[in-house]
Amino acid sequence: MDIRAAEISAILKEQIKNFGQEAEVTEVGQVLAVGDGIARVYGLDNVQAGEMVEFESGVRGMALNLEQDNVGVVIFGSDREIKEGQTVKRTGAIVDVPVGKGLLGRVVDGLGNPIDGKGPIQSTERRRVDVKAPGIIPRKSVHEPMATGLKAIDALIPVGRGQRELIIGDRQTGKTAIALDTILNQKPAHSGTDENAKLYCVYVAIGQKRSTVAQFVKVLEDQGALEYSIVIAATASDAAPMQFIAPFAGCAMGEYFRDNGMHAVIVYDDLSKQAVAYRQMSLLLRRPPGREAYPGDVFYLHSRLLERAAKMGDAAGKGSLTALPVIETQANDVSAYIPTNVISITDGQIFLETDLFYQGVRPAVNVGLSVSRVGSSAQTKAMKKVAGKIKGELAQYREMAAFAQFGSDLDASTQRLLNRGARLTELLKQPQFSPLKMEEQVAVIYAGVNGYLDKLPVNKVREFEDQLLGTLRSKHQDWLDSVRDSKDLSDANANTLKGVVESIAKSFA
């Protein structure tokens, strides 16, 4: 075989010409010490705050403390595989998570990795978890209602799209139940075709038991609500950095809907546990402690998270992200550090009480202490018309009920007030998993406020309500449709309703 030298040199030249000049440079550091989920790393001089780093074992961490001679890294996962002297390399990426509609119906961890065994996430877009909240100009004031399906909330403490409404109460008072009912109440909208009516739901479970989260997901599945929801779970057995980052990850997923002209609601359940996880991380990183040993920036931790919930203006696509943070109090102490912080950040709070819960008032909302600072600007006209009086009457009732315990001889007007209050309180009770549509709530509250229940025994109020709703659904569907479409209670509709309510009241007389 004849080999020509010219040919060989031509082949060599061709290969040399295409030889890649770029060499991959990665900055590598060394683990100085590791323990309690924190690694001290030497040699990562150019690492950014909040950057993801990777350890030899494949475990990831986030650089939080940038000191003169070392970097404090919190570890997302177990630190058992990490040994002193091992190498750590920069990834060059700030912590980000997958976002988009591909996450709907899935359960993921704090970094967006699936944990439900349904295969990889179908998502192409990623977003940073910690971004700046929208400024003042792109926002719009809250003006559309975010229906929870609960009479006590939609009538008295209305929540609007883009609002931040805190759910606060002791353990076992039904905080998660309110959030769950709100998610289930969005099902009818998702069955329809009106994209603007749809509200996508993001639920972040922080520091909860795995069994509790599994039960929550099962209820969503059984009720057909998982298909428009995303569940982010950083359970009690997960590392503190996971519990710290999960709310930010959930927020980034919710912001995808907000920024693309859609509407979403995010539930942080609960932020007390996130604050505890952050306190643990901060103390281990040797940051100076403040009140109740929380770090000085724990207020900023929650404010930068909750400020990202917003109603966007017309130029920014009209989307919205509503936040329902949950805070667990100890023995109804609302004046502790974290509760006062979050109350001051949010636009109102739904205050749940153990005593009410055990008296059978469920949802156990204390109407006197609960407020919505956005208030009636987020209510439909129909609801405003009927629910205007109810708050005042209940406030008077509570005041009188306290005095009535002492005196037996009460005048007629006081007796009337006490009667009405007892029946309105009964009317606001609602079993779990049975949210009501806005127009149905209007009918029920109309009956209560206009005195049709005053002569009824208290134990018949629920029966009256069921009969009223049954009659409207079977014989007056056109009335329900009319109120729903117009969002107002016209005189003609009010007269129709009056007739229906009066006929049912007669049957109870």
From Swiss-Prot:
GO cellular component, one term: plasma membrane
EC number: 7.1.2.2
Gene Ontology terms, MF aspect: ADP binding; ATP binding; proton-transporting ATP synthase activity, rotational mechanism
Pfam families per record: ATP-synt_ab (PF00006), ATP-synt_ab_C (PF00306), ATP-synt_ab_N (PF02874)
Catalysed reaction, written as an equation: ATP + H2O + 4 H(+)(in) = ADP + phosphate + 5 H(+)(out)
UniProt keyword list: ATP synthesis, ATP-binding, Cell inner membrane, Cell membrane, CF(1), Hydrogen ion transport, Ion transport, Membrane, Nucleotide-binding, Translocase, Transport
Origin superkingdom: Bacteria
Keyword S-adenosyl-L-methionine: no
Membrane topology (UniProt): Peripheral membrane protein
Job description of the protein: Produces ATP from ADP in the presence of a proton gradient across the membrane. The alpha chain is a regulatory subunit.
Subunit text: F-type ATPases have 2 components, CF(1) - the catalytic core - and CF(0) - the membrane proton channel. CF(1) has five subunits: alpha(3), beta(3), gamma(1), delta(1), epsilon(1). CF(0) has three main subunits: a(1), b(2) and c(9-12). The alpha and beta chains form an alternating ring which encloses part of the gamma chain. CF(1) is attached to CF(0) by a central stalk formed by the gamma and epsilon chains, while a peripheral stalk is formed by the delta and b chains.
Protein name (record): ATP synthase subunit alpha
Record organism: Methylorubrum populi (strain ATCC BAA-705 / NCIMB 13946 / BJ001)
